[in-house]
């Protein structure tokens, strides 16, 4: 045993707590921002007539708040429907999809009032006021699967703190 390891106080207790809500919101927002940039780059590369050979994706800072708040809300739905009541994925995902479309439509409508809405789906079929389109439904369903995985992971993370005996008793220097 080395002198350093002998001098290091041994932990007497470990305190563990879940990730705080603000941190999960932040992580959902950052993940959503990244997802949108990747999605727009790939979607334009594959489906737009002019293509997107450079794979340039785009988004807006407002998307951070849109995805952060929506994912945080869907996380609470996941906790209630799945963790508390065991509702199967094929029953949860249609509800998630309705929540996503409602959230995007509402955010878009509010942002449009300030000329700040960065998306316009009017050129796609099955759109509502250019704010949402069913063309994206398959992509949203994939994100519903990912949302469950991410929510489960983030809810399982714990922040642990070691409490040492000398911290509890107060360290005395003689």
Residue ranges with predicted function:
Residues 2-174:
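Aromatic-rich, lipid-facing transmembrane alpha helices and their immediate juxtamembrane interface loops
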